[in-house]
Amino acid sequence: MDRPLGENYAGVLRVSAVKSYIKLKENIDYDDYLDINNLQKHCLDFDETTLKLEIDYKLSRAVGESGALNSINEFMYYNNNELIGYIGICHFGGDTLEVNGMVHPEFRRRGVFKKLFRLVKDEWAKRNAQNMLLLSDNNSISGQEFIKSIGASYEHTEYEMFLTSKHKQDILLDNVVLRKANNKDAREITYQDSIYFEIEDKEEDIRIPEDEEKSGMITYLAEVDDKIIGKVRLEVSNSNNIGGIFGLGVKPDYRGKGYGREILIGAIEKLKERNSKEIMLQVATKNNKALNLYKSCGFVETSIMDYYQISK
């Protein structure tokens, strides 16, 4: 299984004549989703760690997309038609790609991940993105070892947090109104992202809210007296009934007034209205103010994800 890669045709790289091949795709379909989900279960059960693969989001975005291979985001290593290795690329705007992956416990230390990662780097070289973030659970020995072996530098750490069922929200939205964003708000959303995440405000990174809503990602603008003071993005997964809260922020001129808490409570209520059984979010460990806010609203830390960076 460690022989050099063979020829590339129709999005498939043959690793050996009989047993192994690598499938390359721009988007996953439902069969891919099932294969990746099955591999993820094997890895999580064995390692007792977490992964950030975003496959529910990817599947929902792929609906209606053409089958043309314009860029490669999905790298799948099969052995006897069983998926044993996977790396996925995510791009959420800016000049940075996010990469996460896994190898079946029974097929580790055989060069599977290295082969996939070489292909990922080849794809990265073709793109304008200057940086690549590699994600690993803080407790993943194999993940941390691989990242160290390629010389990536530590970037930051995030907690994944889930809302406890015991916590009761007793704060009313007295000031903040959450309005679902439409396409006219696209520039405003990109502008706010550039503030909160310290990324350049580029025209090509503009997200179209009504298109994202088709993929289960809904952005709400927070308004006070008809003025936009912040935003939040909610992800609704139909496959596992987990609702996600992302990109929550308050503009600098409106901070210190309790609006962040009101936006958070409003986001929780929106997800409950959509029948989310569990609600999660992610926060940088260095962001003590946000961390304390989330804890005070009933969120508890469930895992730690480390981010490492390599650059061109």
Role assignments for model-derived ranges:
Residues 100, 104, 108, 137, ...:
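Residue-level recognition of the GNAT/N-acetyltransferase active site
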Residues 53-57, 172-243:
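Flexible, substrate/cofactor-facing loop regions flanked by secondary structure
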Residues 19-38, 176-189:
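A short beta-loop-alpha structural element at the N-terminal edge
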Residues 109-122, 149, 247-250, 256-273, ...:
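Conserved acetyl-CoA-binding loop-helix of GNAT-fold acetyltransferases
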Residues 44, 48, 52-120, 124, ...:
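Conserved donor-binding loop and adjoining core beta-sheet/short helix segment
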